[in-house]
């Protein structure tokens, strides 16, 4: 019985971390797209501050980076390992939970979870996130959708 509870716990957290990564990617994408609209720099910064506030990460961010700016918020929310809510941190935690119950997962679920983590890590290492194109969030988000669908 203990083994079933542990498996259920890992599956719950795998899904929860995957969902959190997806939600963060969506919020970043919406904020990025909004920042492209004609507006003052002050209004754009309010959007980035709002994103941090919604995520309850504004104090942690300002401790590390000080003033809010789009580039630092993106890096903090996508790849900063000191941020447990960053996309990379969430995908790493989801992958570790999936790995812990690898024997109970279908091959498709494991491969999708692992491939998503590998792809995002590759994008971060190649600095595609910094130069960020629409495709970056779209491809990451579609991989996460596939994890949920499988």
Label the predicted regions.
Residues 1-150:
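Alpha-helical transmembrane segments and their helix-helix packing motifs
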């Amino acid at each position: 019985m203990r083994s079933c509870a542990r498996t259920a716990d890992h599956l719950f957290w795998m899904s929860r971390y995957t969902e959190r990564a997806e939600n963060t990617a969506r919020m970043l994408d919406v904020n990025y797209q909004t920042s492209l609209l004609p507006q003052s720099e002050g209004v754009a910064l309010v959007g980035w501050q709002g994103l941090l506030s919604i995520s309850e990460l504004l104090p942690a961010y300002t401790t590390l980076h000080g003033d809010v700016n789009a580039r630092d918020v993106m890096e903090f929310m996508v790849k900063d390992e000191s941020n447990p809510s960053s996309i990379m941190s969430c995908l790493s935690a989801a992958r570790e939970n999936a790995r812990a119950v690898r024997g109970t997962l279908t091959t498709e679920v494991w491969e999708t979870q692992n491939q998503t983590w590998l792809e995002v890590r590759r994008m971060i290492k190649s600095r595609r996130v910094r130069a960020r194109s629409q495709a970056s969030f779209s491809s990451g988000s579609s991989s996460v959708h596939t994890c949920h669908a499988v």
